[in-house]
């Protein structure tokens, strides 16, 4: 399993989208880990970035559980 993203990366969920905000000093690459065990695609966020990282809770996988760090390439 991948390790959780640092606390400075904040996840917001709505019915339609799951969004991540990078409040860290460094660029991070994260994906959404859903409660059903599925993982979304990786998204790279520079410091201060806010981006959609997955579907919301009405999507195929339901509620997101947490943001996970993606392996660095």
Swiss-Prot record:
<protein>
    <recommendedName>
        <fullName>Alpha-amylase inhibitor Paim-1</fullName>
    </recommendedName>
</protein>
<feature type="disulfide bond">
    <location>
        <begin position="8"/>
        <end position="24"/>
    </location>
</feature>
<keyword id="KW-0022">Alpha-amylase inhibitor</keyword>
<dbReference type="Pfam" id="PF01356">
    <property type="entry name" value="A_amylase_inhib"/>
</dbReference>
<feature type="disulfide bond">
    <location>
        <begin position="42"/>
        <end position="70"/>
    </location>
</feature>
<dbReference type="GO" id="GO:0015066">
    <property type="term" value="F:alpha-amylase inhibitor activity"/>
</dbReference>
<dbReference type="InterPro" id="IPR036379">
    <property type="entry name" value="A-amylase_inhib_sf"/>
</dbReference>
<comment type="function">
    <text>Inhibits mammalian alpha-amylases specifically but has no action on plant and microbial alpha-amylases.</text>
</comment>
<keyword id="KW-1015">Disulfide bond</keyword>
<dbReference type="InterPro" id="IPR000833">
    <property type="entry name" value="A-amylase_inhib"/>
</dbReference>
């Amino acid at each position: 399993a991948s390790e959780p993203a640092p606390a400075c990366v904040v996840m917001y969920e709505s019915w339609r989208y799951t969004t991540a905000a990078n409040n860290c000093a460094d660029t991070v690459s994260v994906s959404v880990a859903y409660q059903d065990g599925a993982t979304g695609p990786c998204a790279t966020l520079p410091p201060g970035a806010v981006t959609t990282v997955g579907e919301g809770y009405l999507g195929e996988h339901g509620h997101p559980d947490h943001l996970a760090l993606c392996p660095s390439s």
